[in-house]
């Protein structure tokens, strides 16, 4: 039984080849404070896989990187319903990478607003 707002392991992008393909062939965009990459492929079993990244170059302390990734995951988890509906409707696999690209430690509300905007853009471009 699936929980309505879950982020299971199957929805995380963990394959090294898939990550390389996403960064090599994916379309990119920028919504402050994120640079994002999206790769859409046709599929018989539509799914979404997501990657969250906070570069060590910008945030030296691991606890700050972990805090930012936790905020990113939570914002995605609570706002991914429209994306999942569009994926099922169009029958595509979508890989998304969110790369936090500022040195500021932003509040959850700012991060959530940006992720909502990115998910809306990805959903529109189906």
Stretches with model-predicted labels:
Residues 1-126:
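Positively charged, solvent-exposed patches that mediate nucleic-acid binding
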């Amino acid at each position: 039984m699936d929980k309505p707002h879950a982020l299971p392991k199957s929805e995380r992008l963990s394959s090294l080849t898939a990550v390389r393909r996403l960064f090599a062939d994916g379309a990119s965009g920028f919504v402050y404070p994120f640079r994002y990459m999206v790769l859409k492929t046709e599929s018989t079993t539509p799914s979404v896989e997501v990657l969250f990244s906070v570069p060590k170059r910008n945030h030296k302390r691991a606890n700050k990187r972990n805090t930012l990734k936790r905020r990113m995951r939570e914002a995605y988890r609570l706002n991914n319903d429209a994306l999942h509906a569009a994926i099922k409707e169009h029958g595509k696999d979508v890989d998304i990478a969110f790369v936090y690209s500022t040195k500021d430690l932003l509040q959850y509300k700012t991060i959530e607003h940006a992720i909502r905007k990115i998910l809306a853009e990805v959903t529109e471009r189906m």
